[in-house]
């Protein structure tokens, strides 16, 4: 299956292979309200889950895909969205803790069941599907007409104080997402990415079971375990989720490859970028900007801070940023101005940043960025992940730990000035005839020491390009933001449409003042409108 088809259709393959099989008849309420429990509680911890993943990897992969009843297959988006979960069936609704869990119904794009377990005092018990736990809304489905053992598609978490608004959700393949204090969903994370952006179909691992650990009454953290499976790898995950203004997920994972993996993506972030200040190739919409995030931020092992604005390219674009023991990376939404989006329905200015902080040393590898052309904001066309230099091999155990931060600001910020806007347009000198094609870049920086240098005029822009030539370079104060604007024109080689890598930073007296701004520009082909204006 092609990546675009998968993301649009979300034909997810899930099943119960490798988990203890419990008969549906062995069900009980275990003295709790809500869903029935299947079988007897079994001892469970992260080591147990690793053992399950290891056993999965040692056996041939079996597809988990199932065919849904026709009534569920035929649901449209509005019908599926109208199916709600009843509050009186929420997991832990009768417990004194701060958190509850509710479950997603199968249907629409979500075709295969995921097993759900409740973990209490170190023992796990499977939760039975119950059609009576759902309100079927406008779907046309009546309680009792679906199979009694149908299963669930995923789950979401909410607080006891706000049962109508969830702060994290796990739904579809290995996708999950969360929100900060803004309460607005945006980009997603995944358990794993395999062969993303290559000349062959991408592989999408599935979480085939989740174990939700009942938190203590005073705990601010909820722990979730996930069992992952795919043709290439099986894995065990532990998520310690702490809700707050910036939501934290502390993740430990153990991966067990079935076969060699050519491109393994650790801590993948998945986002959407259609049009923004720097890239208006698809600017046919009435809204000035449409994106979940506007840039990739990197904090390298050597301590350099890098900002790479995102693009909606004409063709699939792949970039790798080689590093050793990275300190962090993430897809960020730095532009928080409603006027720049004008969308009062999906609120792009409130979309969360997602920052990845490695635990321990990750060694050699690269942060890889995949940008895919899109004309549709419902298609996630941006992926960023860590790819280890050493390729995983069958029989290995790969242990990886990291933290994910979801919120308006990442937990780590460069001590230097940072980029707040990147704009592009036709180059040349206003009022003078253009003798050749050039492209203008205007990059705004704020923070660091820039504010105190505004009146001193000692700041210069340092620009490098991999081909072509750079001209009309300037760095001037921008008092509206207490920062500086760097401007320059790039003149591509005559007739060339090869990509050009650009590097920019500001300095004063030999001292670096800003993070490093990187860009990849593709000159337009002959005959393009911007080529005819000189």
Curated annotation (Swiss-Prot):
Pathway annotation from the record: Glycan metabolism; osmoregulated periplasmic glucan (OPG) biosynthesis
Cellular component, GO, one term: outer membrane-bounded periplasmic space
GO biological process, one term: beta-glucan biosynthetic process
Biological role: Probably involved in the control of the structural glucose backbone of osmoregulated periplasmic glucans (OPGs).
Protein's UniProt name: Glucans biosynthesis protein D
Annotated signal peptide: 1-26
Coiled coil: none
Cellular localisation: Periplasm
